[in-house]
């Protein structure tokens, strides 16, 4: 992902304030609520019967945290996202058979959650930088599909 110096600063400054457990759980939970077909990959997570059940599900929260911890690694390696996410791409492609479109959806949900959490601090330029990052991460995760 090519970010300007200002964009890198904006992304890393805001990310330093992110509670990965809270934001990760909310982002994954919202993905499962807003795009219910994504739930088929999480059938082992127990009760996904309603929005409240999903948002309160400890396995959803734990996996959301895991996802954002991986995203954090990507932020440290913006110049090598494909390398950073190669093993995860392989896992999601070959073993889990996740539709790569889901990575794009999750990235967009993450941007919405960040906007909700940070309000006025999540300015249009900050959003633009994050959109570049989540698109780059989604492309890296989809890499093994091509």
Swiss-Prot record:
A Gene Ontology molecular function term of the record: heme binding
Modification type Phosphothreonine: residues: 12
InterPro entries according to UniProt: Globin, Globin-like_sf, Globin/Proto, Hemoglobin_b, Hemoglobin_oxygen_transport
Entry annotated with the keyword Cell membrane: no
Modified sites of kind N-acetylvaline: 1
GO CC term, one of those recorded: haptoglobin-hemoglobin complex
Phosphoserine, modified sites: 44
Record keywords: Acetylation, Heme, Iron, Metal-binding, Oxygen transport, Phosphoprotein, S-nitrosylation, Transport
Residues binding heme b: 63, 92
Pfam families membership: Globin
Tissues expressing the protein: Red blood cells.
Entry-annotated residues carrying N6-acetyllysine: 59, 82, 144
S-nitrosocysteine PTM sites in chain numbering: 93
Assembly mode: Heterotetramer of two alpha chains and two beta chains.
Record's function text: Involved in oxygen transport from the lung to the various peripheral tissues.
Family stated for the protein in its record: Belongs to the globin family.
Protein name: Hemoglobin subunit beta
Organism in which the protein naturally occurs: Procyon lotor (Raccoon)
């Amino acid at each position: 992902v090519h970010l300007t110096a200002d964009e890198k600063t904006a992304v890393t400054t805001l990310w330093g304030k992110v509670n990965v457990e809270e934001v990760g759980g909310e982002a994954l939970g919202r993905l499962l609520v807003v795009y219910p077909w994504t739930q088929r990959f999480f059938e082992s997570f127990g009760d996904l019967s309603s929005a409240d059940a999903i948002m309160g599900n400890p396995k959803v929260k734990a996996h959301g945290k895991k996802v954002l911890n991986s995203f954090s690694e990507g932020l440290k390696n913006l110049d090598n996202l494909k390398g950073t996410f190669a093993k995860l791409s392989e896992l999601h492609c070959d073993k889990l058979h996740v539709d790569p479109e889901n990575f794009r959806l999750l990235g967009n949900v993450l941007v919405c959650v960040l906007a909700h959490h940070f309000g006025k601090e999540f300015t249009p330029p900050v959003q633009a930088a994050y959109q570049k990052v989540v698109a780059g991460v989604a492309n890296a995760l989809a890499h093994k599909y091509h």
